[in-house]
Amino acid sequence: MRRDESVARQQRFATAGEALTYEMASTAARAASEMFATDVTLIDLRGLVSYADYFVIASAQTERQTRRVAQEVIERMIEKGHRPRTKRLDEGTAWISLDFIDVVVHIFTDEARDYYRLESLWRSALQERWQE
């Protein structure tokens, strides 16, 4: 997402809390992207569910890369003062889930992402492809 789009989007937030959760999602997306994760997507769940404001979904080519992307996301979020509440790995780490309460980050291998298809479950939600 380009900076001008990000600024315009932030102006649409009703509260400072909404702007903060979007910044958290952006931090996670940027970290994943910089670790060469592909197809990074932000899903805006505000008003649809009570357990999170955003999902950040990213793909990695290998299980090793999913772990490295997850480590980078955690480090960047901690730098911003946000620690993960939980970290869940499926068998073989093809899917890593990081729960930062208002933002949940899902890092998949390409095969796992095709199998679980989270974006299609939330097709009614606003979805943005991360681009820098």
Predicted regions: what they are:
Residues M1-G47, Q61-R68, E75, K80, ...:
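Long, contiguous binding/interaction regions
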Residues A52-Y54:
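Short amphipathic alpha-helical segments
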Residues I57-S59:
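Short hydrophobic/aromatic beta-strand micro-patches
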Residues L98-F100:
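Active-site beta-strand termini and strand-to-loop segments that position acidic
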Residues D102-V104:
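Structural motif
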